[in-house]
Amino acid sequence: MFCSRFSVTLQLDKLYSFMGFFGLFSKEKKETLDKGLQKTKESVFGKLARAVAGKSKVDDEVLDNLEEVLITSDVGVETTLKIIERIEQRVAQDKYMNTSELNEILRSEISALLIENNTDDVDDFEAPLKSKPYVIMVVGVNGVGKTTTIGKIAYQFKKAGKKVYLGAADTFRAAAIEQLQIWGDRVGVPVIKQQMGSDPASVAFDTLSSAVSNDADVVIIDTAGRLHNKIGLMNELTKIKNVMKKVVPDAPQEVLLVLDGSTGQNAFEQAKQFTKATEVTSMAVTKLDGTAKGGVVIGISDQFKIPVKYIGLGEGMEDLQVFRRNEFVDSLFGEAK
């Protein structure tokens, strides 16, 4: 038995090493993901175990309890009802279903939802860029970890051998400019900035001009995180986009919305506001390591039909990961299969 387990462990170590060599999912990244989702896993499956206690089959009461578990885990009402409906259809087909099968059914339905809106072919930082410079405009409210996310993305791209420029176009807060400069110094990449109160579009223009002149591979533009005036936000982001196109015609190639996963339903409201203000093409969900609200990743991806590209799992530079749906589900369910 020991030899068998040792052999399996050795083979897994070899597999993770092989995957890590090709920039895929290393053993260390898997361990970070497992640790980051631990609170969510314990919360969801603790509630689920209580919901099915004493039940031998999946009936209406079990499904009602499961619905409550998912909603209180911040999966969201719409997505929860979609999952419950799909499980009901499977129960109707199978006629009799043990509660012991519920974890596996739930796992498969969550996987199916993530497949609909997320590809496992998301480029890692080492992958060739679709254009040069590849311009990412980052949006999100203050306090969600936007600047930290920008810094970590810059670090990962630089580590992968890319030349990175940062643009401090959140000119409404002196602290935002200072924080981005601190990250630029820490990572070792240039930060293009102007004084507080300057025109954000002007900063974006200067950043792209400098990046093109210096043959940069990646440009990341920070923007103001104000939601109190949706029309003003929309106009500002549109102006930044239009000005960037004067330098790089197809910029920005990506509009990344950063959301704080620990805020649960608040993140849904932020996503709603920003998707109305501008075309968001990808999302980063941060601070998942300190919360039991990891279900928000499932709900937001489903409701807004926008892929989650990054997840934040800790304070370390390496703790921002490219989101891979299969590994996410594996870590979420773990031994609860």
List the predicted regions and their residue ranges.
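N-terminal accessory targeting/assembly segments
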Residues: T9, D13-A49
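P-loop NTPase catalytic nucleotide-binding module
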Residues: L24-F25, S331-K337
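Conserved catalytic-core segment of NTP-binding enzymes
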Residues: Q179, D199-N214, H228-G334
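Short beta-alpha junctions and helix-cap segments that line functional grooves
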Residues: F21, V122-D124, I153, E269-Q270, ...
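Short glycine-rich anion-binding loops that position phosphate/pyrophosphate groups of nucleotides
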Residues: A224-R226
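Primarily NTPase-proximal linker/entry elements flanking Walker-type ATP/GTP-binding cores
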Residues: D34, Q38-A169, A176-M196, A204-A211, ...
